[in-house]
Design a protein with these regions (language model features):
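Conserved phosphate-donor/acceptor-positioning beta-strand/loop module used by diverse small-molecule
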Residues: 125-148, 153-163
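Small-molecule kinase domains that catalyze NTP-dependent phosphoryl transfer to phosphate-bearing small molecules
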Residues: 74-81, 93, 152-197
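ATP-dependent small-molecule kinase phosphotransfer cores
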Residues: 56-111
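Short, Lys/Arg-enriched N-terminal segments with co-localized hydrophobic residues
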Residues: 1-15
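Pre-Walker A (Motif I) flank of P-loop NTPase domains
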Residues: 17-21, 25, 110
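Glycine-rich phosphate-binding P-loop
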Residues: 23-36
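RNA pseudouridine synthases
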Residues: 106, 122-126
Length: 207
């Protein structure tokens, strides 16, 4: 891990009454929809867009910056993360620290579903947290992107390649773990094969 990456202080509490589910996902796998539907089914809060807003309020950074740079590397990958730190910590490093604080505070406050933003790593010391990774075959993710954004196939293909590369670089850098590695999560589900609703049902049974 880079010397400029802000370490997360993880303390395992003696008693934890809340139950947290973190949803990490490949772009185009439907992880955000799964998180939303799961929270509705369980009657708990899903932090996705609202999480971004809370980070905006606490950090003072613009919403677009928080949304894009809170889980994706700037530019093309790990090299940009390293180059940007020649003069010291970057705004992305500061954002990482604030983001970690907000996620930890939410987990302390209530049972909830948290989508993305390395929440699985940030909350890894908690015994009340179930970490999930949602994935799907590349062609099925392309189909979903085309349907969701109305993009031509070639553009959807490029979008996924770029998003995967930047998200992986960000996660690997700040957590010192490999994004998408099954060993980093309690549950990995293929939404392309199972479908959105089946993934929701499986996770609800594990809650």
């Amino acid at each position: 891990m880079s010397q400029w990456a802000v370490p997360v202080t993880l303390k395992k509490e003696e008693t934890m009454e809340n139950r947290i589910i973190t949803i990490s996902r490949e772009h185009g796998s439907g992880g955000r929809e799964i998180g939303r539907k799961l929270a509705e089914k369980l009657g708990i809060h899903c932090y996705d867009a609202e999480l971004i807003q809370r980070i905006v309020e606490k950090s003072g950074y613009p919403a677009d910056f928080v949304k894009e740079k809170g889980e994706d590397a700037v530019g093309g990958g790990i090299s940009m993360l390293l180059v940007d730190r020649r003069l010291g910590p970057t705004h992305q490093d500061t954002l990482w620290k604030v983001q970690s604080q907000v996620i930890s505070e939410l987990a302390d406050k209530e049972s909830c579903v948290i989508v993305g933003r390395c929440a699985d790593y940030i909350l890894q010391a908690r015994s009340d947290c179930l970490t999930v990774f949602i994935h799907a075959a590349f062609d099925k993710r392309v189909e979903r992107i085309i349907k969701e954004y109305g993009e031509p196939e070639e553009k959807a293909y490029r979008r996924l390649k770029d998003k995967d590369k930047r998200r992986m670089a960000y996660y690997n850098y700040y957590t010192d773990k490999k994004w998408g590695n099954a060993l980093n999560y309690h549950v990995c589900l293929d939404s392309g094969e199972l479908g959105i609703d089946k993934c929701v049902d499986v996770l609800a049974q594990l809650y």
